[in-house]
C-alpha cells in the first residue's frame, strides 16, 4: 500500500538538476500510463504478500485475529519507515525502484516457503526455537513493509520526470492506481491464487510478476537514467531473482512433501486442500492407527477416538427420545456412527461446512471403515453449510443435538460457541430434547471450558458438565505444536444440557460400549460449585471470551 510522500513545492527545480524532461522511448502520456500500471501491479503484489502472511501465520501459529493484527500493524509501521528512508534514493529513482522491486519480489515470493520451513523443522524443538515462526513472521512483515513503503517516493519522482503536474493531481493518480491494484490483489488471493495454486505456488507466482513488472518498467522506460553498468547489474539481479523463484516453483512439491513429513511424520497418506481447510490423513493401513488433521490440528486419532465419541454421543442419547438427531460438525462420520447404533433413530442430519471432509469420509477406505460406512446409511442426510446459518433458517425440531466442533479457542469457531449460537440450538430442541457440546480440554484449558458451560446456561439451558480422561494423543501438529508440553490436553470436556436439566447416565437398553461405563461416567461428572471459576462470563458474538 502507498504511504503519502510530500512532493516538491510548486515551482521548485526538479531533483535531476533542472534539466528538461529526460528522453523517453514513448510519448509522455503513454509513459505516464506505464508508470501507473506499474503502481497497480506492485500494489496488487504487495497486498498478496500481506494476505499470504496472515493466512499462513493463522494456519501455522493459530489465532487469526492476533496474527492479522501483528502482520498489518508491523507492515504499516514499516511502510512509513521505508517511505522516509527512500528520500535518499530520489536522485537515483529509476535504479532505486528497480532494486527495491527485485528485493521485494525475492523476499515476498520466498516468505511462505521460509515460514513453513522454520515451522516444520524447528517448531517442535521447544525452548527458544518454539518462537521461531513468530519471529520470522515479524521479520518478513517488517522487510516487506519497508520495501513497499519505499516504492512511492520513487514512483512520484518517476512520474514527475515524465510530465510535471501539480502535487495533488500526482498524488491522486498514484493513490487511485494503488488502491485499485490492492483491490485486485485482495480479491485474486482468495478466489484465484489459493484455490488454483495454493499458498506456496501462489506467492511464488506473485513474486515473479512483481520482478517482471518492476524490471520492465525501469529497463523499458527509464533505461537512459541508468549507466550501462547499472542496466546490466539490474538485468543480472532480476534474472537471479527470477531463477530462484522458478527453482523454488519446480521444487515446491518436493519441499511440501518433506515439510509435511516433518510435521506429521512419514506416514502421510492423503493431503488435500478442500477450499475450507487443509486435510491430512496419516496411517490407517497395515495396522497403523489413522489420524485426521484439519488445518494442522489433530482432529481424530485412531488411538482414542472411540473414547471421545462414545462420551460425546451416548449420554445425550440415553435419556429420552432420540428419533431425530442433529450433528453439528462431525464431517468425519464418527459421531454419526455412534448415533446409528440406536435402532430407533429415524433421521440423522449432519451439518458440515467442508464437503471435502465428508467426501473423504465416504470414499477413503480407512476412514469409511472407521466410521462404519455411516454415510451409506439412508437415515443420514448431509447438509453442506455453516452451522450457525443453518440453525437460523431451519424450522425442524430435534430430540438430540450434538455439537462436534473444533475447540472453542480456535478463532474461526468462536461464533459456534457463543450465546447467540446456543440460543438458536435451544430453538430447534424438541420438548425434552438434549444438547451435548464438545467444550475442549478441562485440565489444560479450564477457563475456556467453563466459559462454554456458562454460555450454554446463558442461553436458557440447564447444564451438566462432565469430562472423560484417558486421552492418549495430545497436540501433534499445526498451531498446537508450539503449545507448552505441560499443557498438552489429556482429557475431553463436555457439557450436557436441556431445558429442564438432563440426567448424566447411560440407559439400560443402549448399545454395548467399549470404553464408557455407568460407573466411569458418574465418576467423571464435574461439580460446578467446586470446579467452576467464580468470575466466568458467557461468550457472545461481539465479546468472545475464549482467548487463554
UniProtKB/Swiss-Prot annotation:
Q: Give the NCBIfam families listed for this entry.
A: MFS_SpdSyn, PRK03612.1
Query: Gene3D superfamilies this protein is in?
Result: Vaccinia Virus protein VP39
The pathway it acts in is: Amine and polyamine biosynthesis; spermidine biosynthesis; spermidine from putrescine: step 1/1
The record's Gene Ontology cellular component field reads: plasma membrane
Gene name of this polypeptide: speE
Top EC class of this enzyme = transferase
Span-the-membrane segments of this chain are: 33-53, 65-85, 102-122, 136-156, 180-200, 202-222, 232-252
Highest taxon of the lineage? Bacteria
The reaction(s) this protein catalyses: S-adenosyl 3-(methylsulfanyl)propylamine + putrescine = S-methyl-5'-thioadenosine + spermidine + H(+)
For this protein, the record's CDD domains field holds:
AdoMet_MTases
The protein here is known as Polyamine aminopropyltransferase
| Entry annotation: catalytic residues | 404
Amino acid at each position: 500500500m502507498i504511504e503519502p510522500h510530500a512532493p516538491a513545492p510548486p515551482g521548485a527545480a526538479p531533483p535531476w538538476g533542472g534539466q528538461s524532461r529526460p528522453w523517453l522511448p514513448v510519448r509522455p502520456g503513454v509513459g505516464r500510463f506505464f508508470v501507473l500500471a506499474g503502481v497497480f501491479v506492485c500494489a496488487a503484489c504487495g497486498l498478496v504478500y500481506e494476505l499470504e502472511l496472515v493466512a499462513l501465520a493463522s494456519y501455522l501459529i493459530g489465532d487469526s485475529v492476533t496474527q492479522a493484527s501483528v502482520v498489518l500493524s508491523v507492515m504499516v509501521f514499516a511502510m512509513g519507515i521505508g517511505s522516509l528512508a527512500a528520500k535518499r534514493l530520489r536522485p537515483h529513482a529509476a535504479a532505486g525502484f528497480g532494486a527495491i522491486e527485485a528485493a521485494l519480489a525475492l523476499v515476498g515470493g520466498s516468505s511462505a516457503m521460509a515460514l513453513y520451513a522454520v515451522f516444520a523443522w524447528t517448531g517442535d524443538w521447544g525452548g527458544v526455537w518454539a518462537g521461531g515462526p513468530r519471529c520470522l513472521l515479524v521479520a518478513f512483515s517488517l522487510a516487506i513493509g519497508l520495501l513497499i513503503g519505499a516504492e512511492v517516493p520513487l514512483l512520484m519522482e518517476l512520474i514527475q520526470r515524465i510530465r510535471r503536474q501539480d502535487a495533488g493531481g500526482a498524488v491522486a493518480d498514484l493513490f487511485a492506481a494503488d488502491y485499485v491494484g490492492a483491490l485486485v490483489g485482495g480479491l485474486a488471493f482468495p478466489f484465484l491464487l489459493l484455490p488454483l495454486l495454493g499458498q506456496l505456488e501462489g506467492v511464488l507466482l506473485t513474486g515473479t510478476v512483481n520482478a517482471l513488472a518492476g524490471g520492465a518498467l525501469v529497463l523499458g522506460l527509464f533505461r537512459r537514467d541508468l549507466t550501462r553498468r547499472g542496466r546490466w547489474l539490474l538485468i543480472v539481479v532480476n534474472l537471479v531473482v527470477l531463477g530462484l523463484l522458478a527453482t523454488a516453483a519446480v521444487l515446491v512439491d518436493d519441499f511440501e512433501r518433506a515439510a509435511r513429513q516433518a510435521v506429521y511424520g512419514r506416514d502421510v497418506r492423503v493431503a488435500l486442500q478442500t477450499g475450507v481447510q487443509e486435510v491430512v490423513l496419516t496411517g490407517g493401513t497395515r495396522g497403523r492407527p489413522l489420524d485426521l488433521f484439519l488445518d494442522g490440528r489433530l482432529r481424530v486419532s485412531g488411538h482414542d477416538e472411540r473414547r471421545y465419541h462414545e462420551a460425546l454421543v451416548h449420554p445425550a442419547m440415553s435419556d429420552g427420545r432420540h428419533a431425530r438427531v442433529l450433528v453439528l460438525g462431525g464431517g468425519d462420520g464418527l459421531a454419526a456412527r455412534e448415533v446409528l447404533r440406536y435402532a430407533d433413530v429415524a433421521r440423522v442430519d449432519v451439518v458440515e461446512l467442508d464437503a471435502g471432509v465428508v467426501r473423504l469420509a465416504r470414499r477413503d477406505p480407512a476412514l469409511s471403515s472407521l466410521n462404519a460406512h455411516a454415510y451409506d446409511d439412508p437415515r443420514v442426510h448431509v447438509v453442506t453449510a455453516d452451522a450457525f446459518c443453518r440453525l437460523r433458517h431451519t424450522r425442524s425440531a430435534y430430540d438430540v443435538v450434538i455439537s462436534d466442533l473444533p475447540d472453542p479457542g480456535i478463532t474461526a469457531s468462536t461464533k459456534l460457541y457463543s450465546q447467540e449460537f446456543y440460543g438458536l440450538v435451544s430453538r430447534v430442541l424438541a420438548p425434552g430434547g438434549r444438547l451435548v457440546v464438545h467444550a475442549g480440554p478441562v485440565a489444560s484449558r479450564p477457563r475456556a471450558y467453563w466459559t462454554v458451560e456458562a454460555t450454554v446456561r446463558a442461553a436458557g439451558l440447564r447444564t451438566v458438565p462432565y469430562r472423560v480422561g484417558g486421552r492418549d494423543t495430545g497436540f501433534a501438529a499445526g498451531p498446537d505444536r508450539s503449545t507448552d508440553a505441560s499443557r498438552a490436553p489429556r482429557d475431553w470436556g463436555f457439557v450436557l444440557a436441556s431445558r429442564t436439566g438432563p440426567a448424566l447416565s447411560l440407559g439400560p437398553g443402549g448399545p454395548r460400549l467399549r470404553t464408557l461405563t455407568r460407573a466411569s461416567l458418574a465418576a467423571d461428572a464435574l461439580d460446578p460449585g467446586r470446579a467452576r471459576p467464580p468470575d466466568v462470563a458467557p461468550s457472545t458474538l461481539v465479546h468472545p471470551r475464549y482467548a487463554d
